[in-house]
Amino acid sequence: FFPTPDTSSISVASYGIAIRIEQIILLPAIGLNFACLSLTGQNFGAVKYDRIREGYLICLKYGLILMVCGSLFLYFGAGYFMKIFTDDISVISTGIHYLQIAALFAPILPVLNISIALMQGVKKPIYTVFISLFKEVVGAAIIIWLLCFYLNYKLQGLWVGILIVNYLSVIIFLFIVNNQMKSLGLEIFRRK
């Protein structure tokens, strides 16, 4: 848990419960990561780059569909899900706020995870280290510090910071993916 001006037991409990609920919602999309990794690895070895593109785009499509549906459950069911784990009104209220923000970035999480699987499948896993360092350390520290301490948004700054870091990570990684795939002679996001 990132140090914020609000490190009360309420915020820690809320985040602990909410992150587990978020992970449950993300579970259906996890299988697509492994599918993309397997398909990419096989087709990369067989030098069938068009099939890599096709598999990647299909996994992205279904990942987005799954997570848009999951986001709707997360956003509108946040209160119900929090009440399953606690009766404390303060914890529920804080958790609802986080889950509703998490619902805004949940649809893009499979994009990052499936893209990471794609890069691993084409034997370029080093880029996943860079994006993970940005997402979990450098970008998170800078953005969350700015929001929580400099702009004084406190706990709300942490939640919004997580949203911003996730979106930036996906945007940066999609540029990396597109660039690296072009170096292999494969244009993932080509125009028709």
Please give the residue ranges for each predicted region.
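Membrane-helix interface segments
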Residues: 8-11, 125-126, 154-155
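Short alpha-helical transmembrane segments in multi-pass integral membrane proteins
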Residues: 40-105, 148-192
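Helix-terminus/linker motif at the lipid-water interface of multi-pass membrane proteins
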Residues: 1-18, 24, 42, 80-89, ...
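Alpha-helical membrane-interface segments at transmembrane helix boundaries
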Residues: 16, 22, 92-100, 135
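Small-residue-rich hydrophobic transmembrane alpha-helices
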Residues: 14-78, 109-131
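Short runs within selected transmembrane alpha-helices of multi-pass transporters and secretion channels
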Residues: 29-37, 102-121, 127-139, 143, ...
